Curated annotation (Swiss-Prot):
Membrane topology, from the record: Single-pass membrane protein
Organism: Xenopus laevis (African clawed frog)
Protein's name in the database: Transmembrane protein 53-B
Subcellular location: Nucleus outer membrane
GO CC terms, sorted: nuclear membrane; nuclear outer membrane
Amino acid sequence: MGDPELDYTIEFPEPSLQGCPWDPEREPVVILLGWGGCKDQYLAKYSAIYHNQGCTVIKYTAAWNAVFISESLGFSSLREDAKKLLELLFDYEIEKSPILFHVFSNGGFMLYRYIVELLHSHCRLNKLHVVGTIFDSAPGNRNVIGSVRALDTILRTSTNNAIRFLALAAFAIMVIILRIVLYPVTKFLHENHYDAMKKDSSRWPQLYLYSRADPIISYIDVESMIAARRRCCLPTEALDFGKSEHVSHFRRFPHRYSEMCTSFLRDCVRKAAVSMLTSEHPVSF
């Protein structure tokens, strides 16, 4: 079941799990979108947060070459992955469940951009019931140094130093030329993900988990996105962990992180249920 070319993992809740507050026929579905170079096992501890709450969890990480090369060159290579990922919900017949996205770094954020566009434009996918989104260490805006550091982390374990340095230099030059110097022109062909999502009007709540100590994603970019949503009166929460590094907030502060995620999930599902009930049974005066 599902697209065989899509390298995803799905975990269903234990039927005997006690104390679950959810409708047994509509348990929440949490979709984890990993960072560039992330492996499935790295997402396991995040998956456990939601699995222990009785949620269905889907884990997916876009290929690092699509994140760092294709998207940087202006090709919308992740759009098809986004569509296939959303179609999994219909394949597994869980399309009526409340959906929460948990998005990691710019790798997950790029994919999420296309997911949001499809949710607002596709005649079938726009019927999905998204209740909230959590961003971990995202988003960043044309941060060349941070992008080079992220790519270096991926290449360091599998590439010799000479090739790695050449690849990093070529990547930095490409990003500077296409996404900064020529961006006033190229944005009409492919608007960068940060600018596109700054105009996103999605009304479901969003939670931003970030840190001023993050060497890859600038806290200024995250706070600018938060401010943009709040100016539009869109429901937005945030927590600055202060000292944790990139996608390391859970490792440094496991209890606080888990508590924030689970309470946000419950609050989103509750508010969405109330909103749906109100729309189905409007009060007349």
